[in-house]
Each structure stands twice: as structure tokens, then as C-alpha cells.
Amino acid sequence: MMAKTEIPVLNLADFLAGKPGAHAAITKELQYAAENVGFFFIDGHGVPRDLVDATFEASRRFHALDEAEKMALKANNHNIGYMGHGASISRASQVYEGERKTNLVAAFFLKRDLPNDHPDIVNNKRFRGANQWPEGLDGFRETTVAYMNAMEGLAKSML
């Protein structure tokens, strides 16, 4: 096995192709990575490179918008929308007792893209609200939804 300072790269190609023994092998690698490193990269996942690239480009385009445009999509009570720099503080540490600083991260949170007449949206079910989409970013929604669907498909194949 690798040193704990290296982030493991798990190649799913054989597993996704259904090769004999691949399930047991990738399970062992995943278990090691999760228990000993805490992080891992996935390769051989079958998500088209052009979709990954288009998604990164869509993200760059969103984050390049003026702050006012992004704040018009401020994260709501469903945790859907934009969270600007300094909008959150990590409180996860049970050991650190010093002053906590705000996170220097900006993020745009989305959920499964549900239609406006979906029962969870109509009934305002917590964390199941409608996504907030920026205006004027051609292809942003389509690219983002395609990527989320690809990731969901990958996740389901790994269950």
C-alpha cells in the first residue's frame, strides 16, 4: 500500500466493465483509502472528459459574475444557492478551542433539479426546494444538470 501522505487514485474501469474480481479489488482499495487516508481520487469512472471540462468552465463563468449577481441567488433555507466568501465558520473540531475564522470559500449549492410542481417543492419540504439558476449564463443549467446526472449514475453503479 502507499504512504499515508499520498492521495490514492481508485481506477473504476475494471469494476464498471464487470471484470471478474474487480469488485473485491476496488472495495479493498476504497476501504483502505477511507480508513487510512480519508480522501481519494476516482479515475476510469466513465464520465466524459468533455462534460467534466464543460462543468469546470460553467463554474468559472458563474464565479466570475459580479458579487451582486451571485448574491441575488443567496443560499436559502433549503441550502440552495450562493454562499459568498466568509459566509460560514467551520465548527466541526471538537479539539480546537481557539478563535475560529470564517471560511475563505465561495460555493454555489444545487440539489436534484425538480420541476416546480413536484410535491416536495409545492409542500416546501426542507432541503428539497427548487434550484436557483443564474440568468444569462447560456448552457449553465444544462451542463450542470448533465454533470449531476452523470455523478448520480456513477454513485448508483458503485452501490
Regions found by a protein language model. Name each.
Residues 1-159:
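Peripheral, non-catalytic segments flanking oxidoreductase cores
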